[in-house]
Amino acid sequence: MNLKQKWDVYSRLTRLDRPIGTLLLMWPCLMALMLAAGGMPDLKVLIIFIIGVVIMRACGCIINDYADRDLDSFVERTKSRPLASGEISTKEALILFVVLGLSAFGLVLLLNGLVVKLSVVGIILTIIYPFTKRITNMPQMFLGVVWSWSIPMAYAAQTGEVPMEAWWLFAANWFWTVAYDTMYAMVDRDDDLKVGIKSTAILFGKYDRQIIGLFQIAALVCFIAAGWSAERGLLYGLGLLTFVGFSTYQQMLIFGRERAPCFKAFLNNNWAGLALFVGLGADYLI
């Protein structure tokens, strides 16, 4: 395997070729940094978190594919992943995971002690998550915690503490993550039932759209509470209104429960997150 082929394998293993996950992680993290700083966060902290999100997203993908390597080959969407297809060995994948994980931890060591402690919890959660799909019907709810963990870390890095405002944002992102990852799980539901992978899409069954809607509403309420705590104004409100518009569109897409529209609904959440981020940023700038 030449260098170009190796890069292609690593890129697919870490999902660098599919940045949607990184973006969905990035928007709430950047919002947390802005809210914690009351506007523009410290440049050093901002750079560390941007790089850290990219690295930890890659780590999460590697450990997820490692855990699912014997099942992914039976799922249409995942059968061509490098570990499932045998393009890379488990040893090489785990070495890459360790290297990236240590790199992320090295960045965290440039910040305060509270962030370091929270980061240890974060890496443990990241490792545990992929295995929850075998023992619980609600792995998306665990993923919501994993994908929201950068929020208390961001507040800790910027202010040295984690106030109630941070937990409102944490709750908002948790509800939102469960909603959009259930849409994602709807894409694989038929294959998951065959191989024994558990998900909220399977758990919710025929009530999936309604429950996703409830989670979207709960996310909105918590985003409002976070903004209220930070005394945000009209432009943040416009961002929230746009978020509602995207959520409504997603409900339309998943109405028929077909694979392609459900995946499109999942991808659309990137724009919902961007709308929230832009609304918050504009509210501080103008």
Curated annotation (Swiss-Prot):
Source domain of life: Bacteria
Membrane association type: Multi-pass membrane protein
UniProt keyword annotation of Lipid metabolism present: no
A GO molecular function held by the record: 4-hydroxybenzoate polyprenyltransferase activity
Transmembrane stretches, start-end: 21-40, 95-115, 142-162, 167-187, 211-231, 235-255, 266-286
Cofactor requirement: Mg(2+)
EC number assigned by the record: 2.5.1.39
GO cellular component, one term: plasma membrane
Localization of this protein: Cell inner membrane
Record pathway: Cofactor biosynthesis; ubiquinone biosynthesis
Annotated catalysed reactions: all-trans-octaprenyl diphosphate + 4-hydroxybenzoate = 4-hydroxy-3-(all-trans-octaprenyl)benzoate + diphosphate
Enzyme class, spelled out: transferase
GO biological process: ubiquinone biosynthetic process
Family: Belongs to the UbiA prenyltransferase family.
Annotated PANTHER family: 4-HYDROXYBENZOATE POLYPRENYLTRANSFERASE, MITOCHONDRIAL, PRENYLTRANSFERASES
Entry protein name: 4-hydroxybenzoate octaprenyltransferase
Gene: ubiA
